[in-house]
Amino acid sequence: MVKGNSWCDKNIKVVATGSNDSGVSWIVEVEGRRIFHAGDLNNWYARFLTDDYEGGTIWSMEFGEIDPQKDEKQYLGELKDIRKIADSFDIVLFPVDGRIGNGYTRGARQFIEQFQTGLFVPMHFVASGFKSAWRMMEFTEARQIPFWKIEREGESINI
């Protein structure tokens, strides 16, 4: 599926929403719950948006030529498009990937600031360690949003 497409049957509805990276993100409605799965949607270059960043294109050994402000604008644009479909989710699965470097929670925080969020489930953090995802707990708890503190691979939860 591509952004804007949807599929449903008598049990589930799936809407493909955008991404500023590969693939799409998803809104899934099942058993009376609305779930958002971000896929690779994130503010991936947040670490470059520092006080000394003067705007425009920069060179990164890891990524080559990038424009962090342009990427953030694209990311926020995708959030705006998602908001046209839904402004609240019972469950949100979102990348909290410490490999991004400083600012790696920025995308998740921006999402939570724009959407009413039930349970927050971090993802894409195994390479940077489970504790790297826990950094979002203080932010979610301050907003009274439950956070699934995943502590090992294969862990599951009943919702």
Sequence positions of predicted segments:
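Binuclear metal-ion centers of metallo-dependent hydrolases, dominated by the metallo-beta-lactamase
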Residues: M1-W7, Y104-I159
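Small-side-chain structural scaffolding
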Residues: A16-S19, G23-S25, V92, A108, ...
